């Protein structure tokens, strides 16, 4: 971290934005909207592992443990990235930057959340789910946040592995093991992550450049970025079809139709940039959220209705 922002973070000037309540400020540290998307992938993974509807208690425990685990990683990320957040317009209202939560308190909060999440998953689900959850926290904080994010344009590619863990945790909570469908779902989220975040980074390119974060849109041309987005989008859709043997026609129909819409928008973004036309990467960003959510809802619906899978 640079010396100036670090020193500034120890001061306590009056924030320029209205203060939240204490609970709201700590909640904001956990990045609830990010947690929501992570949990959207957890429950369908549990449905597929059960090939039906799993125990409501197990679902509740896994969601609670998963939410606290993700919240822990996000809070610790806010601590490590407070210098970056202070100079980015998109993140300058976060609690540490606006001095609503002391840095030390945020650190303790993140650690406590992680410990509690491990205990909840270990006692309420199983040890494997708890260990995978802890591994995700450590990877996100120490590998992505402290190493990859500030050093390579491939930061989100490899660092995104932490965001793929909820599907594996959900599967492990039900089965006590990790099997090939869980790895396929991991692959889907892994390949989906670059198009999702690179489209956002295209919008906030100047923000990342000002903060010294080498996101791909900062170090590459828009055409190069959109070309890679297109490649990863195709790879994502192809990976979704690897789940066909474990599902029925319900999932396949959703996967094909939603995948086609995802690819069309990614292709349009690339075409607009290649032809020198005006473009809006946020269309792909917002669609990518809906695409992943619908895809995993399809997995849950397919598992709940109980139709025979293509490979029994």
Swiss-Prot record:
GO BP terms, alphabetized: heme O biosynthetic process
The membrane spanning regions, by residue number, are 21-41, 53-73, 105-125, 127-147, 156-176, 182-202, 225-245, 246-266, 292-312
Q: Which Gene3D superfamilies match?
A: UbiA prenyltransferase (1.10.357.140)
Its main subcellular localisation, reduced to a broad class, is membrane
* Disulphide bond pairs: none
Q: What is its EC number?
A: 2.5.1.141
Q: Which GO terms describe its cellular component?
A: plasma membrane
Report the pathway entry. Porphyrin-containing compound metabolism; heme O biosynthesis; heme O from protoheme: step 1/1
Alphabetically list the UniProt keywords. Answer: Cell membrane, Heme biosynthesis, Membrane, Transferase, Transmembrane, Transmembrane helix
Which terms in the Gene Ontology molecular function aspect does this entry carry? protoheme IX farnesyltransferase activity
Recorded catalytic reaction(s): these are: heme b + (2E,6E)-farnesyl diphosphate + H2O = Fe(II)-heme o + diphosphate
> What membrane topology was assigned to this protein in its record?
Multi-pass membrane protein
Short name of one Pfam family for this protein? UbiA
The enzyme class is transferase
Localisation: Cell membrane
Function statement: Converts heme B (protoheme IX) to heme O by substitution of the vinyl group on carbon 2 of heme B porphyrin ring with a hydroxyethyl farnesyl side group.
Assigned protein family: Belongs to the UbiA prenyltransferase family. Protoheme IX farnesyltransferase subfamily.
Other information = Carbon 2 of the heme B porphyrin ring is defined according to the Fischer nomenclature.
PANTHER family hit by this protein: 4-HYDROXYBENZOATE SOLANESYLTRANSFERASE, PROTOHEME IX FARNESYLTRANSFERASE, MITOCHONDRIAL
Name of the protein described by the UniProt record: Protoheme IX farnesyltransferase 1
Lineage start: Bacteria, Bacillati, Actinomycetota, Actinomycetes, Pseudonocardiales
**Chain's gene name:** ctaB1
């Amino acid at each position: 971290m640079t010396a100036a922002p670090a020193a500034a973070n120890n001061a306590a000037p009056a924030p320029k934005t209205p203060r939240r309540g204490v609970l709201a400020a700590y909640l904001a540290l956990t990045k609830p909207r990010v947690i929501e998307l992570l949990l959207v992938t957890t429950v369908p993974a549990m449905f597929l592992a059960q090939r039906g509807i799993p125990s409501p208690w197990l679902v509740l425990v896994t969601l609670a443990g998963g939410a606290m685990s993700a919240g822990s990683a996000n809070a610790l990320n806010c601590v490590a990235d407070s210098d970056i957040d202070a100079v980015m317009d998109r993140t300058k209202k976060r609690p540490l930057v606006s001095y609503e939560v002391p840095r030390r308190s945020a650190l303790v909060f993140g650690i406590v959340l992680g410990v509690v999440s491990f205990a909840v998953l270990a006692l309420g689900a199983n040890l494997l789910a708890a260990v995978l959850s802890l591994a995700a926290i450590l990877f996100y904080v120490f590998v992505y946040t402290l190493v990859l994010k500030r050093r390579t344009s491939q930061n989100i590619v490899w660092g995104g592995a932490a965001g793929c863990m909820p599907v594996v945790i959900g599967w492990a909570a039900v089965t006590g093991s990790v099997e090939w469908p869980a790895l396929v779902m991991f692959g889907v989220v892994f390949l989906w992550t670059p198009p999702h975040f690179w489209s956002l980074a295209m919008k906030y390119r100047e923000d990342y450049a000002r903060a010294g974060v080498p996101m791909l849109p900062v170090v590459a041309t828009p055409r190069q970025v959109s070309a890679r987005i297109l490649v990863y989008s195709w790879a994502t859709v192809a990976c979704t079809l690897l789940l066909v043997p474990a599902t029925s026609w319900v999932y396949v129909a959703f996967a094909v139709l939603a995948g086609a819409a995802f690819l069309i928008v990614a292709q349009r973004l690339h075409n607009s940039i290649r032809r020198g036309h005006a473009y809006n990467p946020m269309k792909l960003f917002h669609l990518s959220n809906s695409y992943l959510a619908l895809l995993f809802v399809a997995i849950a619906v397919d598992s709940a209705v109980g139709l025979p899978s293509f490979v029994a």
